[in-house]
UniProtKB/Swiss-Prot annotation:
Recorded superkingdom: Eukaryota
Extracellular side: 1-23, 80-104, 169-180, 245-256
Provenance organism: Mus musculus
Stretches of the chain found on the membrane's Cytoplasmic side: 50-58, 127-147, 200-217, 279-296
PANTHER family: G-PROTEIN COUPLED RECEPTOR (PTHR22750)
Protein name in UniProt: Adrenocorticotropic hormone receptor
GO biological process, one term: adenylate cyclase-activating G protein-coupled receptor signaling pathway
Taxonomic lineage of the native organism: Eukaryota, Metazoa, Chordata, Craniata, Vertebrata
Gene: Mc2r
Family, per entry: Belongs to the G-protein coupled receptor 1 family.
Amino acid sequence: MKHIINSYEHTNDTARNNSDCPDVVLPEEIFFTISVIGILENLIVLLAVIKNKNLQSPMYFFICSLAISDMLGSLYKILENILIMFRNMGYLKPRGSFESTADDIIDCMFILSLLGSIFSLSVIAADRYITIFHALQYHSIVTMRRTIITLTIIWMFCTGSGITMVIFSHHIPTVLTFTSLFPLMLVFILCLYIHMFLLARSHARKISTLPRTNMKGAMTLTILLGVFIFCWAPFVLHVLLMTFCPNNPYCVCYMSLFQVNGMLIMCNAVIDPFIYAFRSPELRDAFKRMLFCNRY
């Protein structure tokens, strides 16, 4: 986020003498390359679901929602790089009205990426829970109509929240709201996991008769969640430290890894499609048919 970058640069100037940790600077080409790969991979996921009717189910629609979130995160960085390039070439007036508006739009995309990922993973967790413990009623509970309504509400909420957070991005309550959604999502999914574990112990025989794909879907969610936490948690921690201890030498030392934390976010968009392909034979076959022009 541009607001965070600007605040970080200001913090760096005021706290430079309090820390011996130099800033870790990564070439912009690395960010650009990872972002382009992330967009292309997730675009293939979306096209695979759109073109294959056997993949047009609630579970894959939720995966598409996560793929869109990943694409927004990658697109954010590409647009930011283009904006910086135009500004350095003199085509944009520094801190002019156009650049400020473009910054706000790009920041909104970044927030949409995080919020979209959080809620997409949450509905995938709920979907897996229903699949395992209400297998017989699954198709009557999780219908396509309810899936579309749920995703529409999620993205409307994320869009409204993203716009609000950009407008009030310099207020501490906004930062707290932004960062609190991350642990709240983890708590929600953790509660589902604990409940699933307790029910699994009491219904072990019943669960053993479920199709293997049901349990495989739960494992896929676990992997996706683990990658999401690994890639996003360092950035969320950076925002908290920048807000509450900007001049502490230990906090400043951690914040010197800002660009590394940003690269991890970009990597999340690249890793997720590989998880889909590795864990889902149907999606993997769809990828092969698309890449080899239906000759596979």
